[in-house]
Amino acid sequence: MRSMSLWMLIGPVTGIATWASLRYAATTTTSSTAAASTRMGLAPVIALSHGGGPLPLLGDPGHKSIIHSLSHRIPKILSLNDPDRRPRAIILITAHWSTAAPTISGAANPDLIYDYYGFPPETYELKYPARGDPGIAAEAAAAFRAEGLGDVVVDPGRGWDHGVFVPMTLVRPEADIPIVQMSVLASEDPTSHLRMGRALRALRAENIAIVGSGFASFHNLRAMMAMRSSAGSRNPEGARIQAISREWNSALTDVVDKNPWQGLEGWRSLPGADLMHPPRGGEHFMPLIACAGAAHEEEKVRWYTDEYLGVDIYTYYWGGSDVE
């Protein structure tokens, strides 16, 4: 998470997690099947929640539900265990890279950027040796230009931040699927992010999945610390945040389900938006907007929830396999 270490608030945990040993039952809701995406032959789109810093890779108990979903649900949505259906590459839009213009990582073998501080030494030695794909990066840049998105940049030196390697270590520990990383816009302009997603629709037809890595339901560090220190709903402030979170998630899910383009253009007017994502602090919401733009109008969204700090954290997806 940006500009703060949660490690000092949490204390030591159990060490780098053994993914196969983690099991957790969380909530899933399905609004339709994946039939439209299957008919069109499109790779899935997923706006996932990546957790706080490297904590999902440390087995942090507060991330138990998120860890389970990253290591079990997301691979199922992407059909990663089916060699005939798994995507040939992933375009990953990360909340931890904000730029003035749409920017795409063009490196064939990206380094990792350990953009967190105050964590155990082993978190600065993590490796995720998946390849980049300069050809797909160039294709995505051309799609952005065709959409009229301005001065698109392909950055051959940019490494992968923890919005990429932390969730992907859980999603695909084999690290055998190429990844192209994309920035969000510092302007936080929702229409531009919707258009970024729309530009990527054609790449879905080439079996390239689109993954947004953020924290769409809740990314307010001050409120998160209040929830952790107050033991959640046992404190009046925690109960207040939980109530606002429920109202926000209900309104947001209704918008994403029924009117994503117009509704997300006006997302700041949704109840609770400024608490869940403080003004000028909406970067962790932008990947969801781009993912919604990458979905075709006839595709219906599905979602599941994870528990985090006593509130529901939603992951939205279009296409792919249903999960429970």
UniProtKB/Swiss-Prot annotation:
Protein name: Dioxygenase tasH
Organism: Hapsidospora irregularis
Similarity-based family: Belongs to the DODA-type extradiol aromatic ring-opening dioxygenase family.
GO molecular function, one term: ferrous iron binding
Subunit structure and binding partners: Monomer.
Pfam families in alphabetical order: LigB
Domain of life according to the entry: Eukaryota
Record keywords, A-Z: Dioxygenase, Metal-binding, Oxidoreductase, Signal, Zinc
Cofactor binding annotation: Binds 1 zinc ion per subunit.
E.C. number: 1.-.-.-
Binding site for Zn(2+): H50, H96, H284
Major enzyme class: oxidoreductase
Cofactor dependency: Zn(2+)
Signal sequence range: 1-25
Role of this protein: Dioxygenase; part of the gene cluster that mediates the biosynthesis of the tetramic acids Sch210971 and Sch210972, potential anti-HIV fungal natural product that contain a decalin core. The PKS module of tasS together with the enoylreductase tasC catalyze the formation of the polyketide unit which is then conjugated to 4-hydroxyl-4-methyl glutamate (HMG) by the condensation domain of the tasS NRPS module.
